[in-house]
A protein has these predicted regions:
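C-terminal beta-strand-rich structural cap/linker in extracellular carbohydrate-active enzymes
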Residues: 162-172
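Single conserved hydrophobic/aromatic residue that forms the stacking wall/gate
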Residues: 1-9
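Carbohydrate-binding surface patches
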Residues: 105, 116-155, 166
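Aromatic/acidic polysaccharide-binding cleft in carbohydrate-active enzymes
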Residues: 18-99, 115-116
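Loop/turn elements at helix/coil->beta-strand transitions in domains of secreted/extracellular proteins
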Residues: 12-15, 50-55, 109, 134
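Short, glycine-/Ser/Thr-/acidic-enriched flexible segments
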Residues: 23-24, 62, 143-146, 168
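Long, internal scaffold/assembly segments composed of regular secondary structure
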Residues: 10-11, 21
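C-terminal structured subdomain/cap of oxidoreductase catalytic cores
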Residues: 14-16, 100, 148
Length: 172
């Protein structure tokens, strides 16, 4: 997904927004561990680290029969959240729910990406942001099989955190 975005970014007169990404039967959409790692790496962090200003996830909510949909539309998609048609109360949270949740919990409207390089030697991928109120946000992914200790430095403040294997963490 994120490959080639740097070339498009060279057109400074164009705003990059990554649109219409989905999960479904074709990409093991119910496998939360696999999808969360891949979607956070490619769809969320991979796009914003390559100059995209936003990511639009399709579909936000579907039912457990992958609907409603229109003729010719995706018949095999899952939503960020799927709701059980038998009671309209039971929900299944899928990977896109969690990528939206991690980013929106710390990155606020109008925020700008700041000083982040993406992958590190320790197998951590991250994006850092500055919100309009001056707070800073960090979303990171440990896509390795081991726990990683990280230290985050921001001016005069710093903290250390132990990131579990195959985990996403958000800080503000």
């Amino acid at each position: 997904v994120s490959r080639g975005l740097g070339d498009v970014y060279k057109r400074q007169d164009k705003e990059l927004i990554f649109t219409e990404t989905s999960i479904g039967m074709w990409n093991d959409g119910r496998n939360l561990e696999k999808r969360l790692m891949e979607d956070m790496e490619e769809t969320a962090l991979g796009t914003v680290n390559n100059w995209c200003k936003a990511v639009i996830v399709w579909n936000l909510m579907l039912d457990n029969e992958r609907g409603p949909n229109r003729e010719g539309g995706c018949q095999t998609c899952y939503g960020a959240v799927d709701i059980d048609r038998s009671d309209y109360k039971t929900i299944t949270r899928n990977s896109h729910y969690y990528i939206i949740g991690h980013l929106s919990s710390v990155v606020k409207p109008g925020a700008v990406r700041i000083g982040s390089k993406g992958y590190t030697a320790d197998g951590i991928m991250y994006s850092a942001f500055e919100n309009l109120d001056g707070t800073e946000a960090l979303v990171l992914l440990n896509n390795t099989d081991g726990t990683k200790n990280i230290t985050v430095n921001s001016g005069e403040r710093s903290f250390t955190y132990e990131v579990p294997a195959k985990a996403v963490a958000s800080f503000r």
